[in-house]
Amino acid sequence: MRLKDVFVEFLNSKNIRCISTNSKKVLREDPIQFIARNFASGKFEICRGEGRFSFNLKGERIERCEYVAWKCEGISRDEIENELDKFPYIVVDCSLKHLHSDKELKSLIRQIEKTLSVVRKYMWDERLVIAGMKTMTSALHYESVEDFLREKKPERVILLDPNAGEIFHGERADCYIIGGIVDKTGNKKGTTSLIYERLVDNGFELERRKIVLRGDILGVPDRINHITEIVLKIVLDGMEVEKAIYDVQNRKIARWRLRREIAKNSRRIEVKGRPFRIIGKSFYEEVVGWLKINKKDFYRCASEMGVIVVDDELQSVAKEALLFKAEMN
């Protein structure tokens, strides 16, 4: 469940069927999530009274409500502390920022800002932790991941690392660590493992897992905000890993994986001594369900690779010819 779901359950348990607030910012997003986030952060408490903007618990505007979430003394987050503690921390380890160029650092900061926006859709600001780098965001900041782990003492910690041996299947953890790494120059491959080695050397127990799409990391979005959203869709929304990846995946990332799949599934034929590679039109239908592509992407990638898209009947004939040739040899 997302924070707003927990908040609605809590309000219902108090026989509160609507909520209002005085902040105009509530109109910019999901109003219940906005109020829930400020309640969880301790900025709002719930009191008797009428705010400027009123909503039912589905987030629909109503004329008035006798309860207001605002800067007052009333029902506080302390009453749902146990439920709030069940939400995971997303920790971005920026200890390797010294390896980044100025351009990469700017990209890292942008990704962190977008990550906060993602966290706000599912949880609240203090569930995002930035370690090893100061930012202008309202996330929690620590000098190091080690400082955070010593203070919060999470029981289960998972480091998301594309080079890990174990696969992430949606395991629940108290803390997910993501490497604050932007690699535009190609000189940081495998550096997330340095974070794992450092934490283990410093006496911390953690698991190391990779997110894969049908057995391969290719096609899995690698931006920090995208990884965060995939994880939260899985662990809070209960979404399957492949579906979460598909929801977050953009077409550029999808085309990278598509090229791999075309290379694996195309066939080599010879026509009058000239070699060609072909692939059936129906292959598009095989991948469109888990790669966010359209037909234009399919034909474009095949063309760039020198692969000819043919009717499936022709591909079947070519396959039979190849089998016959193999048998004759």
Please tell me what each predicted stretch does:
Residues 1-89, 97-99, 329:
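Extreme N-terminal leader/targeting regions
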Residues 64-139:
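A structural/positional concept
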Residues 111-129, 145-147, 198-208, 289-297, ...:
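Structural alpha-beta junctions
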Residues 251-329:
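C-terminal, charge/polar-rich interaction regions
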Residues 117-187:
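S-adenosyl-L-methionine/SAH cofactor-binding core of RNA-modifying enzymes
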Residues 104-105, 171-172, 187-192, 314-315:
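Short coil/turn segments at secondary-structure boundaries
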Residues 194-257:
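Structured adenosyl-cofactor binding patch, chiefly the S-adenosyl-L-methionine
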Residues 91-93, 129, 158-159, 177, ...:
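Beta-strand cores of modular interaction/reader domains in eukaryotic scaffold and signaling proteins
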